[in-house]
């Protein structure tokens, strides 16, 4: 480095060139360091996947030798298979990152994972030969005297509604009679690097795993029953590539969601496999859906995964958001509402379905009759009255669903406000007369302490009475827990969040997720970065409809 005045060139140009050369040298060193770190991470992820794969083999051999058929052993094998699935996908993601980092240098060789040799396709599988139109002139000199030299064949496994075929993409080679140069059409893009699985089949694998909650080991078993040998690690490899490929779309959906003026937010539990035990993680979702008040913005949902429910997670998610947040009364949201820390503060609108549910649990006659702990206890008349009052409010909401925000607000001011004001007066009066041991104190305090947030629907017609939009978005996670039991790792939960984002957003826009995935995975590799917005589900739907109209 140039550190002494005597080392500096006399002329300004020389000094500039020296500084520029030093800057470029530092950039090169930084790129090398980043590439080496990425390679090290890729090697570490590969070794972790290898260790779990060997543990799985050992456990299977031990089971065969000792004849163990216990439920515990079967569960252990399932856990190892799911953990291996997540580690292989993580190793593939790290390999992609290492390749990208190494491409920026000329001295660091990218780490490449060792993969098992792919087994040949069955002899009786259907094959379709697709010949790319060859060049008519020499790509070197422009001559037209071409003669066929040979051909390269790329085999891609594709799905045709549970019927499989191998597409042989032929690229014929031609040699020029004039200059002896060889001409050949460039190889086509694959949905994933080095991928031998077509976009339609890849879309099915992704949708079955994240949309229908079928783990990859079950999918592998199903493929084997149909005569196709695709191991769990092979499928996980493709899932890792596909998730990385879809990240730009995830980022665009994220930007769209947090640009909304009003959001629904909620979370649910998700068991995450750790080294020694399962931890209780969380899946968070934020949904923008303006259809209840006639809004024209496309609906969308974004998901995140975390290892716990600490408030730092939603605070990080919503750090750049300003507007209305409809949620439950989780106190982890509270710090983000401080106006001094945000240009546009967050205003909370609490869910009345949560509040009503607390009263309903004390007024549910059938449930109380089944509950041994409450046997003999009378139904709370206050809770029953609160449920009846809420039912009147919800009936008004059903009548104004889909109207404009202004129309909704006008109806609420006329019909809902008198009911809600009277409810506040009644709850305050009843609360003052209750003893500390009364069970109904909890739901009353739940509302009275947060009354401003519960009353926001009377001031803004955009606000919904419930947070059902977010709860519906998390319903698939609750259903999935019954099938896959737990996420194989934290990174596996993160991948699930990415795929849930695109699949749920497709569903919110009445789009077949498999059709969208198949088309986007086939196009995204060579789609211009400046036009990535065209792949957003609602833009894709608009373009598809226009294409159908032109064809008609």
Curated annotation (Swiss-Prot):
Residues spanning the signal sequence: none
Superkingdom in the source lineage: Bacteria
Keywords assigned: Plasmid
Keyword Nucleotidyltransferase included in the entry's annotation: no
Pfam entry (one): LZ_Tnp_IS66
Family membership noted in the UniProt record: Belongs to the transposase 25 family.
PANTHER family: BLL1576 PROTEIN
This protein's name: Uncharacterized protein y4hP
Organism: Sinorhizobium fredii (strain NBRC 101917 / NGR234)
